[in-house]
């Protein structure tokens, strides 16, 4: 299979699977964090509290993506980090993280 010369190679990630540290800088609890706390819900009691530590290592991650020659990156935001109480009061530190 051949790709056109203008094909854009990229990568994508999910906030819960990569960021870790959900309560850092005032972040709230997501549905996944609550689910993972339920006994027996997840094998071995695993959770995303550290994940890939993208919260602290995002600059290194960006360098790695660039070194792979990727020209696009799609990431998701953690609404629990942006609106920790689910009441529309934005967490400025959460917004700054994604800016």
Protein language model annotation of sequence segments:
Residues 1-99:
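Non-catalytic accessory regions flanking glycosidase/transglycosidase catalytic cores in CAZymes
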């Amino acid at each position: 299979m051949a790709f056109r010369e203008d094909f854009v190679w990229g990568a994508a990630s999910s906030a819960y699977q990569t960021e870790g540290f959900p309560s850092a800088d005032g972040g709230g609890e997501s549905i996944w964090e609550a689910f993972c706390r339920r006994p027996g819900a997840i094998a071995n009691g695993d959770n995303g509290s550290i994940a890939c530590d993208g919260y602290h290592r995002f600059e290194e991650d960006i360098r790695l993506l660039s070194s792979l020659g990727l020209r696009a990156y799609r990431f998701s935001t953690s609404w629990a980090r942006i609106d920790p109480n689910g009441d529309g009061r934005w967490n400025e530190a959460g917004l700054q993280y994604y800016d």
